[in-house]
Amino acid sequence: MKKGLVLATIFALCSTMMVSAKEFNDARWQWFYSNSDYTGKVDLNTLSYDPSTDTAQAWAVWVQTRGLQELREYDIHFDNSSVTIKHYYIYKNGSDTAINEGTANNTRTPAPGSGGEALIASVKGLVGRDTKLADYKKQQADEAQVQEQKRIEEQQAAEKKAKHERNRDILRGIFGI
């Protein structure tokens, strides 16, 4: 009876610890990079992309082998392959309480072959950047073409009106009207 009570208590404590610990293993977190020091995962639920600025927003977590997890909010600038770390939260493995947090606004270009470069490539594919940017550029070109056509038509109408006025003035001068 006592063994059962002890086992039930241990099970309850383990379950509570597992529920309250900060976990980055559910379906919303997709792996994008690993090395001997850390693993990077991106949050699929918070990805967004703005083709007018060619910038994506993403949250990523870096799970370190030394027992820390760093959750970061990024702006990813595809035009120059740089990232801006906006906010960060650092957790100890197994804890749901951040031991450090802050606002960084630190922009940098990741080194080739690094986790930051892998983050850019992963987010680029996940948000469909190339397709959305091509669609945006086509839409902008189409709108510019429509505006140019409208400008040409307005210019032609103004020239026609000016020619008509000039001819009318000439006829008035000839006939003395």
Residues covered by each model-derived region:
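Sec-dependent N-terminal signal peptides
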Residues: 4-15
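N-terminal secretory-pathway/extracellular module detecting exported/lumenal segments
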Residues: 19-177
